[in-house]
Amino acid sequence: MRQGCALTLMLLVVVCAALSAAQLNFSTGWGRRYADPNADPMAFLYKLIQIEARKLAGCSN
């Protein structure tokens, strides 16, 4: 019984250490694709969606 508890505790410590190492090594730039610096079409679509959402919200009241 005591050996099983020690093994479980050791496994828990190893898992916690592995997770903390993964958090320390995380990079926010990982996996990003090249984005077009001209974001005007995206801004236009975002504003258009907002306008339509406001219209729909106004109709439901």
UniProtKB/Swiss-Prot annotation:
Leader sequence residues: 1-22
The Pyrrolidone carboxylic acid modification is found at 23
Q: What is its main location?
A: secreted
InterPro entries the UniProt entry points to: Adipokinetic_hormone_CS (IPR002047)
Gene Ontology molecular functions: hormone activity
Q: Does the entry feature the keyword Secreted, yes or no?
A: yes
For the biological process aspect of GO, one term held by this record is: neuropeptide signaling pathway
PROSITE patterns hit by this protein: AKH (PS00256)
* UniProt keyword Signal present: yes
* UniProt modified residues of type Tryptophan amide: 30
Q: Which residues cross the membrane?
A: none
Subcellular location(s) of the protein: Secreted
Q: What's this protein's function? A: This hormone, released from cells in the corpora cardiaca, causes release of diglycerides from the fat body and stimulation of muscles to use these diglycerides as an energy source during energy-demanding processes.
Q: How does it assemble?
A: Adipokinetic hormone precursor-related peptide (APRP) can form three type of disulfide-bond dimers: p1 (alpha-alpha), p2 (alpha-beta), and p3 (beta-beta).
Protein name (record): Adipokinetic prohormone type 2
State the organism of origin.
Answer: Schistocerca nitens (Vagrant locust)
